[in-house]
Amino acid sequence: LMSITGVPDGEPGAGPVKVGVAVSDLITGLYASNAIMAALVEREQSGRGEYIDLALLDSQVAALANQALNFLFTGQSPQRRGTAHPNIVPYQAFPTQDSWLMLAVGNDRQFEAFCRAAGRGPLAEDPRFRSNADRVAHREALIPEIEKACRQKTTAAWIRLLAAAGVPCGPINNIAEVFEEPQVKHRKLRFDVAHAK
């Protein structure tokens, strides 16, 4: 995981970076809870118990998902790309006037909508960027254009504009900002409990 996490080689600050939380532990716990539920169903149906064998390594290798598949199909180890997705462009963080925006353009229709909303219509018509495969192949030409566009507005302005256009995006919040997010409050993801003392 660390080999594909961090700043790309050749850029300032390059090198592997630890993920900000104990992701292997969390994923293994989720896999374990699913395995336990499946074992309980089996016991209920057949009366037999199950032996669950799960290691952190198993979970981490499984969690490599598309990155592992990229390697298995091509034989080439994926490289670090910072916040960029290896197979979808543009799908990464961009600096705005005041902070950062995570842009998640998952298909050609969304790319066209982004270009129109950003006032960069010609990008959608450029043959280098017509399909996702084209955008992946010409990533180095496209990303600087999107960076220029994103720096023209605040993150909040982009979120309003792109939400109206149907383009997935969101702010990159620090932890304090996370707990102030309206949806986090609505979902009651923070709650206070009384301490014994």
Cite the ranges covered by each PLM segment:
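Active-site-adjacent "lid/gating" segments in soluble enzymes
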Residues: L1-V105, E112
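Short coil/turn segments at secondary-structure boundaries
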Residues: V17, A84, P127-R128, I159-A163, ...
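Alpha-helix/helix-capping structural signal
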Residues: S59, R109, N173-A176
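Short secondary-structure capping/turn micro-motifs that flank functional sites
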Residues: Q60, S131, V178-F179
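Aromatic-enriched alpha-helical interface/lid elements that frame and gate functional surfaces
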Residues: V89-A165, C169, P182
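A glycine-rich dinucleotide-binding beta-alpha-beta segment and adjacent secondary-structure elements
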Residues: A164-K197
